[in-house]
């Protein structure tokens, strides 16, 4: 989500630190900053591009420093501005910290530290780390960081420097990546290997719970109890361009592989005492209590995620959920009354039609709950409540990990609505438990990548596809068809499986494959009959089904299995498969899936 760089050594110039930080620009960010110790201890940070930061430092770029840390920020707590940019400092301005991740218990820590006399200058969760290290510091920076991280809950990668410790960076990792290496007279760490490659190709990847002491000539790694750890050194053969993509050929491929982490990021801090928890909704639960109808507006992939939410909430409550494509809603007479709830979903928070739909709904008295990935975006600012996806920057035009993240937030929101309206039961407990366990299962799904690529090779030359599904399988079919259209330019259409006989089946023949989304759910046998109908028209069939479902054995065709889960969660479980199938076809056809023709990442015009 953010980018971290740390350097310690001799003969280093500030330009080296800034240039290394620029190697992380591809990750996306809204502000940047550095802290450095040379002839003096300084911090400089600015909202905007690294070029803005660099321009402000232009008189100092040739200044020498001994130790420095740098950061690109993607806002999660506090809007994007100079004050909230990293690094953050302690009260004495002796300690500087950069951080990637989310500190779940930062409010409790902040209250404790304020009672101890600490004064805060930002709205971020990160600043508590600097003050916590200050609170624990008694001359040993490692010891202070070890004590501090034991009090943190959530995900983090941090790098800490102290003005009185000129030869050391202390770094720690839990849930967010950090990699380090030693070059000629320089120790360097970063969020990924890209900034390291100018100095060394021999690197060590920190593991969860690791705390590292980095110096110019070496490093030590400890666990949080202060016991030394051994970590393998890897030799990296990537060049810098490949390293930006983590060694993957395309950003889209990398971002699909980040689906499990995106799910973790969306869930972190949002489950307490085995119940869904949204700090953002603390003062707005009345909005969702006793609601008899909820409206949803969104576009594209976000619309399909909204459909999943509709099915989920209507299957588990008596609440009606009406969902419309934003470009239609904004031009209709809105049947909205004072106090109605409208949920707006947009990765960028800048989708023009969704913004206009929100403005129309607000004129009629609706309260807006938005689900957004970009903090400080227009939709964020114009909403009553914003629930962030926390997926981090997504570079590829086609939504992948943000689809997973918005689904996760919508499931949690649905469960929260169930809880506050008296629908909480043992099945809700089961769904939440399986949702929390889902990241590990998504890792298992991604291990099927070679099989999916083989299937893509087999089907890449077809010119038409029909995706079908029932219930929760239908939004997945819609999203699968959209992915294929977006990046392969193959015509793909999606239907409710029960609609085949009402017209679409006339299209099917040996040159028109059917991609059937059919998890082992209450509608499985209905969908199975539609697949058999399709095969009787000689259509090639791909089935996306569930491991252990022996009824799939009766279907001859290509089958991809995913692990079993609660039937409402299959859209999450199956997302990586439909993404990888489309990605590999695009790649095998020699297309660039990161930049499909005629498409933009954020649709900011009508």
Curated annotation (Swiss-Prot):
CDD domains: GFAT (cd00714), SIS_GlmS_GlmD_1 (cd05008), SIS_GlmS_GlmD_2 (cd05009). The active site is at residues 2, 601. Signal peptide: none annotated. One of its GO terms (molecular function) is carbohydrate derivative binding. The keyword Repeat applies. PROSITE patterns: GATASE_TYPE_2, SIS. It catalyses: D-fructose 6-phosphate + L-glutamine = D-glucosamine 6-phosphate + L-glutamate. It comes from the Bacteria. Its EC number is 2.6.1.16. It is an enzyme of class 2 (transferase). It is found in: Cytoplasm. Keywords: Aminotransferase, Cytoplasm, Glutamine amidotransferase, Repeat, Transferase. Residues 284-423, 455-596 form the SIS domain. One of its GO terms (cellular component) is cytosol. Residues 2-217 form the Glutamine amidotransferase type-2 domain. The keyword Transcription regulation does not apply. One of its GO terms (biological process) is fructose 6-phosphate metabolic process. Homodimer. Catalyzes the first step in hexosamine metabolism, converting fructose-6P into glucosamine-6P using glutamine as a nitrogen source. This is Glutamine--fructose-6-phosphate aminotransferase [isomerizing]. The lineage of its organism: Bacteria, Thermotogati, Thermotogota, Thermotogae, Thermotogales.
């Amino acid at each position: 989500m953010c980018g971290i760089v740390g350097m310690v050594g001799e003969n280093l110039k500030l330009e080296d630190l800034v240039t290394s930080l620029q190697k992380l620009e591809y990750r996306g960010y809204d502000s940047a900053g550095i802290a450095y110790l040379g002839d003096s201890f300084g911090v400089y940070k600015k909202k905007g591009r690294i070029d803005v930061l660099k321009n402000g430092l232009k008189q100092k770029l040739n200044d020498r420093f001994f130790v420095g840390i740098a950061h690109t920020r993607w806002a999660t707590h506090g809007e994007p501005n100079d004050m909230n940019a990293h690094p953050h400092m302690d009260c004495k301005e002796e300690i500087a910290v950069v951080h990637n991740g989310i500190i779940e218990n930062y409010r409790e820590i902040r209250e404790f530290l304020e009672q101890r006399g600490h004064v805060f200058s930002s709205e971020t969760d990160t600043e508590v780390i600097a003050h916590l290290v200050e609170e624990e510091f008694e001359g040993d920076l490692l010891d202070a960081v070890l004590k501090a991280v034991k009090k943190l809950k959530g995900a983090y990668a941090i790098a800490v420097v102290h003005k009185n410790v000129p030869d050391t960076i202390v770094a720690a990792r839990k849930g967010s990546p950090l990699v380090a290496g030693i070059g000629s007279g320089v120790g360097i760490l970063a969020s990924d290997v890209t900034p390291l490659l100018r100095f060394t190709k021999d690197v060590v990847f920190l593991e969860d719970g690791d705390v590292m002491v980095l110096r110019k000539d070496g490093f030590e790694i400890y666990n949080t109890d202060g016991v030394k750890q051994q970590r393998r050194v890897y030799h990296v053969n990537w060049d810098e361009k490949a390293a930006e993509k983590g060694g993957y050929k395309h950003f889209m491929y990398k971002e699909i592989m980040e689906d499990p982490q995106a799910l973790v990021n969306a869930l972190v801090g949002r489950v307490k005492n085995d119940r869904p928890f949204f700090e953002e909704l603390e003062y707005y639960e009345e909005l969702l209590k006793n609601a008899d109808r909820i409206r949803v507006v969104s576009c594209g992939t976000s619309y399909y995620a909204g459909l999943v939410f509709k099915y989920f909430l209507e299957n588990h409550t008596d609440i009606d959920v009406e969902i419309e494509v934003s470009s239609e809603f904004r031009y209709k007479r809105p049947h909205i009354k004072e106090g109605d709830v409208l949920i707006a979903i947009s990765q960028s928070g800048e989708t023009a039609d969704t913004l206009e739909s929100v403005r129309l709904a607000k004129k009629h008295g609706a309260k807006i709950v938005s689900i957004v990935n970009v903090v400080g975006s227009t939709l964020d600012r114009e909403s009553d409540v914003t629930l962030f996806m926390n997926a981090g920057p997504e570079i590829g035009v086609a939504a992948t990990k943000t689809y997973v993240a918005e689904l996760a937030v919508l499931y949690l929101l649905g469960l929260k609505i169930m809880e506050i309206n008296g629908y909480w039961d043992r099945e809700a407990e089961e769904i939440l438990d399986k949702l929390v366990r889902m990241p590990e299962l998504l890792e298992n799904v991604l291990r099927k990548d070679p099989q999916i690529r083989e299937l893509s090779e087999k089907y890449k030359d077809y010119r038409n596809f029909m995706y079908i599904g029932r219930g929760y399988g239908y939004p997945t079919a819609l999203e699968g068809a959209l992915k294929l259209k977006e990046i392969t330019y193959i015509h793909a259409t999606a239907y409710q499986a029960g609609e085949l006989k009402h017209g679409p089946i006339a299209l099917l023949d040996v040159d028109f494959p059917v991609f059937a989304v059919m998890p082992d759910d209450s509608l499985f046998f209905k969908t199975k009959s539609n697949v058999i109908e399709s095969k009787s028209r000689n259509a090639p069939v791909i089935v996306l089904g569930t491991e252990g479902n022996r009824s799939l054995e009766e279907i001859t065709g290509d089958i991809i299995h995913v692990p079993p889960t609660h039937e409402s969660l299959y859209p999450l479980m199956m997302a990586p498969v439909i993404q990888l199938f489309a990605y590999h076809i695009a790649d095998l056809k020699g297309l660039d899936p990161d930049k499909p023709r005629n498409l933009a990442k954020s649709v900011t015009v009508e």
